[in-house]
Amino acid sequence: MYSFRMFRIISNNSKHSKAIHLMRLDMIQAIPFELKDQNFNNLNNVFIGSNEERILTFVSLNSSDTASSNSMLRRIIYRYKDKGLVRTTTLANNENIVVSEEILLTDIENLQIYFGDSLDDLNNNYPGLNVVENNAFPQFVVLDYEINDKKFNQIMSFFR
């Protein structure tokens, strides 16, 4: 018989795996859709990443919504807020209309995210400060973080 402690460990590991797999699935389904800000101004970028609260923003296909009357495109926003990883989906062209919001992980410490086209040349922000317009995704997204004093390093890609 499993003890409560063992059940909690299995449950936490399962949540962690599901969160990372969901992030990877979102990246695989990402499309080059130019983003607009909350005032509907063109940002001339298809992907925005930073080490601020809002770590990832891009548009992806929504495979769970099969209704033909609605667009299957969703803006995906990942936030690092109050030591948690939060996934928010909105309409692709209107960030003000939230479709769903879910806390995927809690108790995350020291989250750092890096972006780049080579693992030897990663940056804290994407696109870089000197890029005005970018219609591409970074080749790599690297997340370094700790949960319950265990260090994790995830290397992900948009496969573009």
Identify the residue ranges that each predicted region occupies.
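Extracytoplasmic beta-strand-rich oligomerization domains located immediately C-terminal to a leader/signal peptide
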Residues: Y2-N94
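Structured surface patches comprising rigid loops and adjacent beta-strands/short helices at the edges
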Residues: I28, F33, E102-D117
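Short acidic, gly/pro-rich beta-turn/loop elements at beta-sheet edges
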Residues: S68, T88, I97, N123, ...
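A short, polar/proline- and glycine-enriched secondary-structure boundary/capping micro-motif
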Residues: S69, E95-L104
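Short beta-strand-initiation
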Residues: S71-L73, V99, P138-F140
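Short beta-strand segments
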Residues: R74-I76, S100-E102, K150-M156
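Short linear sequence signals and composition-biased patches located at protein termini or domain-edge surfaces
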Residues: E109-R160
